Design a protein with these regions (language model features):
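Short, flexible loop segments at boundaries between secondary-structure elements
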Residues: 192-194
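A polyanion-binding, active-site-adjacent surface
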Residues: 16, 28-176, 180-189
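Generic N-terminal amphipathic, Lys/Arg-enriched alpha-helix
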Residues: 15-25
């Protein structure tokens, strides 16, 4: 059901349950043909397969980190694809879930650079609330199959989010870890952002 993934069909228009400041900057995306197709594809995936994150958390990155409060963007590829891991924030896992290797590596870098101990929890909600947009380029994934939703159209939407930040904000730190994330460098004006 679209309601469960933050998408509601209203006649032929699509309404997205997303934080107000993001909705203002991205509302033009919701009426584009790709978004209607994306909505239908995601609905079918959630209806016919086990998918992550839970539907109500698909737009969690946007809902926890309003547009005007973004200071840092950490870009991932797609959500974790095992049960109980994905929570709509790139690299984050709920309290009590074992740290995935990618998050362990992030924590090791922080420990190396700042001499901070590695946290036991992988829940990065606090980061999001402090202005870190933990964004995956693809917002959903089928269980046990990495990159399974990469061709559904999410990247059109998340690229638009990056482009909106690039155009309407300044001095945001973009952390593009890995080859896939670095491919998004083309969306960012290095004269305005780090």
């Amino acid at each position: 059901d679209l309601c469960l993934i933050g998408l509601n069909c209203i006649q032929e228009n699509v309404m997205v349950d997303i934080e107000a400041s993001w909705k203002q900057h991205l509302e033009g995306e919701f009426t584009k043909p790709y978004f209607a197709q994306l909505t239908e594809s995601v609905r079918n995936e959630y209806r016919n397969s086990l998918c992550f994150p839970p539907g109500k958390l698909v737009f969690n990155a946007f809902n926890l980190c309003p547009f005007d409060r973004v200071k840092v963007v950490i870009l991932g590829q797609d959500p974790y694809h095992e049960q109980g891991q994905a929570m709509g924030l790139s690299f984050s896992v709920p309290e009590g879930i074992m740290l995935p290797p990618s998050l362990q590596n992030i924590y090791k870098e922080i420990q190396s650079d700042l001499s901070k101990p590695i946290p036991a929890s992988g829940d990065l909600t606090r980061w999001a609330k402090q202005g870190v947009l933990l964004l995956n380029a693809t917002l959903t994934v089928r269980a046990h199959i990495a990159n399974s939703h990469q061709t559904l159209g999410w990247q059109n939407f998340t690229d638009a989010a990056i482009e909106a930040l690039n155009a309407h904000r300044e001095h945001i730190v973009f952390m593009l870890w890995g080859g896939f994330a670095r491919s998004k460098k083309r969306l960012i004006d290095a004269n305005r952002h780090c």
